[in-house]
């Protein structure tokens, strides 16, 4: 994806790709969008130049005292550098209503001191964002779910893949070699997928590896072949151990212990039998439980996780009620993009780092049709002593990206969100909220902005005691405090994502979700042969002895059918040792 800032006469480096825009809002005012503005034509360029000058002037006059010349309130500095606002996600090109800068001034939350922007000034700012900043989709940015479009691709035989890996690993010193593993996209090239689609998988792999990292560093996998289909990783770069890798390969239905001299050399150097896995399977499997939880070492309960993070939520809330230091802040609202009912989100500062936060949501089941929520489920009636039905946890990893955990009403870890409590309305192909996968997609731009509705509601109500009013005021932070902390956490995530170099969108979808949905698609003969690492002729020759593939020469089979029978069929094709042919080494 290429990015043009019209009138700015500047082009972002390709490494950044599409910058991470401002998060969508979570809460009551989240549903609007400015629409598809399209690209300015030549007649508009002069107007854009004038609007750019006017926007710079009005931001200088109204905002620079807090957000420029070294002042960086709310993690926002250089307010008059319009390219910076776009690059760092404070302005979403072509969409004012999803841009932090516009939303803050349009809602009158900013500027904190001084007169709010007038209608004409708001129109100027909105028009500049909607019309004069454009994200231009690259024609090569293709959906991963599209059928392969490059039938001329020549598959890389398995023996050549092994030779490439062997030539790479023998150059490493012994310690590095033992921590080295490989992920392959070669079968996608062999199946006829074009470079643009394979590039999408590269972005998904890069993003996911760092979303699964226990290390403070961002690390991209290293391509070892000219076609960039074979990738090397070092376990230590992600804070993983050999046990972590074993948990991955133990889950792999495509695991094959390859034979031959090259494979033997690799196994000896890496000190492991299963040194290579298919990258698209890894993206699919490791982005969701149980493997997601295993790799990130997320324990069985919310309370154990908080202990690992050095966090005492109960004590923090008690301290906040006593001292009001904004170490804990909440926002409650009626409508959410994920929850069927009202919702509360709560932020804690992680003690290990000023840049890492722990967010906890309190979610509630929808009231039965024709009935009202019970008082202890209605956060406007019970903002302090509610009884939640479940929740989502988001916390910053050491590298600044996010990790996720779904819990039930008792704080026990669950793999999917209860459908009566939460759903993923932004991904109709996968409406069930799957921990990890759905969360990465929903929070692809960091925290979703929330606006509290509780404090104002309670302040106008005679139904609360003086102490309850004070407690609500201390927990449900003022808008400027809550916004500042949200923007701080957004900046932490955005900076980490930029460091990965991964695009925020592939074929119009978040990369990991796009790869997951594509992986679930049907398997044809060419794809099957490529995944086995053999020719289509080799598959057809053995077809009568294979399971689940009897019609693959005429029609596709489902991914589930192909996967369930892979280990057996790999034995029939004699490509190596699987769980179903342990004696193949002697053949």
Please describe what each predicted stretch is.
Residues 73-77, 102-126, 136-137, 496-523, ...:
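Axial heme c-ligation environment in periplasmic c-type cytochrome domains
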Residues 170-441, 447, 453, 571, ...:
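Extended surface/linker regions that mediate inter-domain or inter-protein docking
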Residues 15-17:
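C-terminal motif of bacterial Sec signal peptides marking the signal peptidase cleavage site
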Residues 20-30, 35, 39, 44-123, ...:
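Solvent-exposed helix-loop boundary motif
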Residues 142-152, 448-542:
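Domain-exit/linker segments immediately C-terminal to small folded modules
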Residues 56-79, 130-141, 435-453:
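Periplasmic/extracellular electron-transfer cofactor-ligation site
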Residues 542-587:
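C-terminal non-catalytic accessory extensions
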Residues 1-10:
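Bacterial N-terminal signal peptides that target proteins for export
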């Amino acid at each position: 994806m290429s990015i043009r800032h019209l009138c700015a006469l500047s082009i972002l480096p390709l490494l950044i790709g599409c910058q991470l825009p401002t998060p969508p809002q979570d809460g009551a005012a989240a549903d609007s969008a400015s629409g598809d503005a399209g690209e300015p034509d030549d007649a508009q360029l002069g107007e854009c130049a004038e609007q750019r000058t006017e926007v710079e002037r009005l931001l200088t006059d109204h905002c620079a005292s807090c957000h420029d010349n070294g002042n960086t309130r709310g993690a926002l500095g250089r307010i008059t550098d319009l390219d910076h606002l776009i690059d760092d996600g404070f302005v979403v090109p072509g969409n004012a209503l999803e841009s932090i800068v516009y939303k803050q001034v349009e809602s009158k939350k900013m500027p904190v001191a001084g007169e709010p922007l007038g209608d004409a000034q708001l129109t100027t700012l909105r028009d500049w964002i909607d019309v004069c900043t454009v994200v231009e989709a690259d024609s090569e940015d293709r959906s991963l779910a599209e059928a392969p479009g490059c039938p001329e691709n020549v598959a890389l035989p398995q023996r050549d893949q092994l030779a490439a890996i062997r030539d790479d690993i023998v150059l490493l010193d012994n310690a590095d070699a033992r921590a080295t593993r490989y992920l392959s996209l070669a079968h996608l090239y062999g199946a006829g997928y074009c470079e643009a689609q394979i590039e999408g998988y590269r972005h998904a792999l890069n993003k996911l590896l760092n979303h699964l990292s226990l290390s403070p560093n961002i690390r991209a996998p290293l391509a070892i072949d000219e076609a960039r289909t074979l990738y090397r990783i070092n376990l230590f770069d992600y804070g993983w151990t050999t046990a972590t890798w074993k948990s991955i390969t133990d889950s792999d239905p495509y695991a094959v212990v390859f034979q031959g001299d090259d494979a033997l050399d690799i196994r000896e150097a890496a000190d492991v039998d299963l040194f290579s896995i298919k990258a698209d399977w890894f993206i699919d499997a490791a982005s969701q439980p149980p493997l997601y939880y295993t790799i990130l070492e997320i324990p069985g309960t919310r309370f154990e996780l908080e202990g690992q993070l050095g966090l005492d939520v109960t004590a923090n809330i008690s301290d906040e009620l006593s001292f009001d230091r904004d170490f804990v802040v909440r926002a409650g609202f009626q409508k959410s993009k994920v929850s069927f009912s009202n919702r509360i989100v709560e932020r804690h500062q992680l003690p290990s780092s000023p840049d890492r936060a722990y967010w906890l949501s309190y979610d509630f089941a929808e009231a039965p049709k024709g009935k009202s929520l019970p008082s202890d489920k209605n956060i406007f009636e019970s903002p302090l002593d509610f009884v939640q039905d479940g929740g989502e946890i988001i916390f910053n990893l050491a590298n600044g990206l996010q990790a996720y955990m779904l819990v039930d009403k008792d704080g026990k870890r669950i793999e999917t969100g209860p459908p009566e409590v939460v759903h993923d309305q932004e991904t109709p192909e996968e409406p069930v909220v799957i921990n990890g996968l759905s969360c990465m997609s929903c929070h692809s731009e960091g925290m979703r902005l929330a606006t509290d509705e509780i404090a104002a509601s309670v302040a106008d109500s005679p139904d609360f005691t003086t102490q309850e009013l004070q407690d609500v005021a201390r927990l449900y932070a003022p808008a400027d405090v809550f916004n500042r902390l949200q923007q701080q956490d957004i900046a932490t995530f955005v900076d980490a994502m930029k460091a990965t170099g991964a695009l925020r969108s592939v074929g119009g979808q978040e990369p990991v979700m796009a790869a997951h949905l594509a992986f679930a698609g049907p398997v044809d003969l060419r794809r099957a042969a490529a995944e086995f690492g053999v020719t289509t002729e080799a598959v057809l020759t053995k077809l009568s002895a294979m399971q689940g593939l009897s019609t693959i020469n005429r029609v596709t089979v489902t991914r589930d059918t192909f996967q369930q029978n892979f280990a057996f069929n790999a034995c029939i094709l004699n490509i190596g040792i699987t769980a179903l042919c342990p004696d193949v080494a002697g053949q």
